[in-house]
Regions:
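ABC ATP-binding cassette signature C-motif
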Residues: 1-209, 303-468
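Extended, highly charged alpha-helical segments
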Residues: 60, 84-97, 182-297
Length: 468
């Protein structure tokens, strides 16, 4: 029996939302192919995955599927449900998935010491081992190095059910997906191919729609002008008719010819007003907003208020060694960072990059308010705290931060009204708050994790110009 997933006119709103997050979404997800779910942070990508897996029920519409469904979450804080069963299973399927995704047999008891990249591979291996008919993956490429992404791509290409994937990695989506569902709240549009192909098609359609709207606007202006001319002519004629009507008929007008002429003129006047009204109606229809045309918001942030620390070094630590657990040690030399240095920390998953950053951060030589630090992962409790702190800001600083959030591609009103901002939105809040304070030191651990595709390009451009 064929496995599939079908959305029919599906709408969804969280309690308290003034408008639905998703509205009238109709889409078909076939077996044997992957569908990319593409949209800005907060557009409803995770919500759609949860609807697909049955973790949420639609407010309106129906979702039809055959078989089982599995949703693999974004976060890797805790082991996934069924972790012990998976690691204690020795059948061919479990062994194959652990081998394919490089899951070590010793990982069963040391989740807390695994890197986030290792946790992500383990999470996906378990999901594939379940062999669900519908598999929904939320940011599976987060934390993975190039080797890990290649391994993941190979593993997902062996999956034969109906797959849905949310990812900020454009190249990964292009290589894996046969179609992409683009979310522009509350609407959704399915396009064939990967995200690059779909975006190009969307660009062409938007260009055509704007050209059509501009042409219609020109026609509307001409019709409105013609309507005004008709009305003015009708008003002038009506005034003349009124004056004639007020005159007495000639004494010799025994057959009523004069009165019939006046009545005829009145009829023409009425027709002139009718024509004017019809032209105005046509003009209004042509000038009406086109719902298919999206509003383009200005994107991009700049560290305009950033400065340079007035000291020789913003970090100066002696050589040291860090315990990575499981008998592993990371030895580092003396480390110094000057105010203008740009440093990339590279290495495979599990080698201690994040551990080193956590060791160095308490030793930086800049005031706390001048440090912009975005960690690799932010817990749900910490996310809620950050969101509540944001809403408590006074109007002026809140306006500054939300302007920057808007320029990172999220809608401020929707974000402030949300009770559960997405991980990507939380990272945007941290980035915007840091930019607004004018940082002297910027530390980012996997900065593109959880960010939507347009937002990734904004920090790249800003960091290239940052003075610190």
């Amino acid at each position: 029996m064929a496995r599939f997933l079908q959305f029919d006119a599906v709408s969804f709103a969280y309690p308290g939302m003034a408008a639905p997050l998703l509205s009238d979404v109709t889409a078909f997800f076939p077996e044997g192919g992957w569908t990319g779910i593409v949209g800005a942070n907060g557009a409803g990508k995770t919500t759609l995955l949860k609807l697909a897996a049955g973790a949420l029920a639609p407010t309106n519409g129906t979702i039809r599927q055959l078989g089982t469904a599995c949703y693999a979450v974004q976060r890797t804080d805790a082991p996934p449900v069924g972790w012990d069963d998976f690691m204690n299973c020795w059948d061919a399927a479990a062994l194959d998935e652990r081998r394919r995704l490089g899951v070590g047999e010793d990982w069963a008891e040391r989740w807390d010491t695994l890197s986030h990249g290792e946790r992500k591979r383990a999470q996906i291996a378990l999901a594939l081992w379940r062999a669900p008919d519908v598999l929904a993956l939320d940011e599976p490429t987060n934390h993975l190095d190039a080797t890990g992404k290649a391994v993941l791509l190979d593993a997902l290409q062996h999956y034969h059910g109906a797959g849905l994937i949310v990812s900020h990695d454009r190249d990964f989506l292009d290589a894996l997906c046969t179609q992409c569902l683009f979310l522009f709240p509350p609407r959704a549009t399915m396009r064939p191919g990967g995200v690059t192909e779909g975006r190009e098609q969307d660009r062409r359609e938007q260009t055509h729609a704007r050209e059509r709207h501009d042409a219609n606007a020109g026609k509307a202006r001409r019709l409105a002008a013609a309507a005004q001319q008709r009305r003015e002519a009708a008003e002038q004629s009506a005034a003349r008719t009124k004056r004639l009507k007020e005159r007495k008929p000639p004494a010799h007008d025994h057959d009523g010819r004069f009165l019939r002429g006046v009545a005829k003129l009145q009829g023409k006047d009425g027709w002139g007003f009718t024509q004017s009204a019809e032209l105005r109606k046509r003009a209004a229809k042509l000038a009406a907003p086109d719902a298919s045309i999206r509003v383009d918001y200005t994107l991009g942030v700049a560290f305009a208020e950033a400065g340079v620390a007035q000291r020789a070094y913003v970090l100066d630590v002696p050589p040291g060694a860090l315990d990575l657990g499981d008998g592993r040690t990371l030895v580092h030399p003396a480390l110094q960072i000057r105010p203008n240095d740009r440093i990339a920390l590279v290495g495979a998953n599990g080698l201690g990059k994040s551990t080193l950053l956590r060791h160095l951060l308490p030793q930086v030589l800049v005031p706390e308010e001048r440090l912009l630090n975005i960690p690799q992962e932010i817990s749900e409790d910490e996310s809620r705290r950050i969101h509540e702190e944001l809403k408590r800001l006074d109007d002026v600083p809140l306006g500054r931060v939300m302007t920057l959030v808007s320029r990172l591609g999220s809608r401020p009103a929707r974000l402030l009204a949300s009770t559960t901002p997405s991980p990507g939105e939380i990272r945007k809040i941290l980035l915007a708050r840091g930019v607004a304070r004018g940082p002297h030191l910027i530390v980012m651990d996997e900065p593109t994790n959880h960010l939507d595709l347009p937002s990734i390009e904004c920090p790249e451009a800003a960091l290239a110009e940052a003075p610190c």
